[in-house]
């Protein structure tokens, strides 16, 4: 990936050759949300004499981090990474997005609530990860920040793994993590200092574990790629739930195969990490698996990433609408990420996530 200075120069001079693949631009139709304009906005914001306003800084928040523009770029520039880290420039200039005000405090509170929710449940409190075991990290969706928190997903994780363990005694010992969050929101907001501190604390808490298993696609990418980029390498190996389960797929105690489904491939798993394990697992538990079109590098982002649902909820919904309309789904949609599934459902397009179906298919 070219460095920031080179990337900004090349992008500002580019005749918008990647605009046609940017899902944010496609859904909005706004010239100010082409990758070229967003990178030019960041270039202007970084000038020593710059006196930017919140309105002028807004374009750099119009990115979900999906990476579609990079696949179309001859220079393999990473506008997503530069724009996300460039949001720190906006924060330092006091022109950060108002929707992200007090984000570190809110994330810390949410992580605490998620941890407490697990510890309050006697069943889950007795299943915490011990040194040497596989650590299970439930997602930290906003809908789970109060009340039950991540309890429902944590119970689903344990249910699937417990059922598998009855047939594969060689499955490693596992337990729940109570860290609450991997800190994706801090990274996506461009709060580098807060994110680095949070990441270092997270890394310390999981240092005694050999493996981390995540359900969220963005957190998987964050832990595998972004942590090391920020100088915080993790000791444990990071696996998405589907990666962890795939070697044991033939032993999954499938009681009944589920009807045909349409698979939604999350950007951070498919385009970023080239992980197709969720689809392969669905093939084990479903009669037929179709794909939400287009597929591969041409797939459309649903709008769940980059904090776009917080900074521009209307645009995030438009992206979900386009992804589903273009996808031509003829059966229920299943996402490889609970965050994507939640966003699609909230946008009026019911979608389930992989874990839901794993529980259903293995229920006697």
Residue ranges and their predicted role:
Residues 1-60:
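Ferredoxin-type iron-sulfur electron-transfer modules and their immediate structural context
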Residues 15, 26, 67, 74-77, ...:
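Cys/His-coordinated zinc-binding microdomains
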Residues 76, 141-236, 268-364:
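Cofactor-cradling patches in redox/metallo enzymes
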């Amino acid at each position: 990936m070219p460095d920031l200075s080179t990337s900004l120069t090349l992008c500002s001079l580019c005749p918008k050759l990647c605009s046609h693949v940017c899902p944010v631009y496609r859904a909005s139709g706004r010239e100010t949300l082409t990758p070229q304009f967003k990178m030019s906005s960041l270039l202007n914001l970084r000038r020593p004499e710059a006196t930017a306003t919140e309105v002028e800084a807004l374009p750099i928040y119009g990115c979900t981090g999906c990476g579609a523009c990079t696949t179309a770029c001859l220079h393999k520039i990473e506008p997503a990474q530069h724009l996300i880290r460039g949001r720190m420039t906006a924060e330092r200039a006091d022109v950060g997005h108002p929707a992200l005000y007090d984000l570190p405090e809110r994330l810390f509170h949410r992580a605490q609530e998620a941890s407490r929710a697990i510890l309050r449940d006697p069943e889950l409190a007795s299943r915490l990860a011990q040194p040497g075991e596989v650590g299970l990290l439930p997602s930290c969706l906003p809908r789970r920040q109060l009340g039950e928190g991540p309890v429902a997903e944590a119970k689903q994780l344990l249910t699937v793994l417990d059922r598998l363990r009855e047939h594969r005694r060689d499955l490693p010992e596992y337990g729940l993590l109570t860290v609450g969050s991997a800190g994706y929101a801090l990274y996506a907001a461009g709060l580098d200092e807060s994110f680095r501190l949070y990441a270092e604390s997270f890394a310390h808490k999981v240092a005694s574990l050999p493996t981390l298993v995540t359900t969220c696609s963005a957190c998987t990418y964050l832990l595998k790629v972004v942590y090391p980029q920020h100088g915080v390498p993790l000791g444990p190996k990071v696996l998405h739930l589907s990666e962890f389960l795939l070697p044991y797929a033939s032993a999954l105690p499938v009681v009944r195969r589920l009807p045909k489904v349409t698979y939604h491939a999350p950007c951070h798993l498919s385009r970023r990490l080239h992980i197709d394990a969720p689809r392969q697992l669905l093939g084990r538990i479903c009669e037929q698996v179709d794909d939400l079109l287009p597929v591969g590098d041409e797939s459309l982002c649903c709008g769940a990433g980059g904090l776009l649902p917080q900074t521009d909820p209307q645009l995030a919904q438009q992206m979900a609408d386009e992804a589903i309309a273009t996808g031509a789904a003829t059966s229920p949609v299943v996402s490889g990420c609970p965050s994507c599934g939640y966003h699609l459902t909230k946008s009026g397009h019911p979608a389930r996530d992989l874990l839901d179906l794993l529980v259903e298919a293995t229920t006697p």
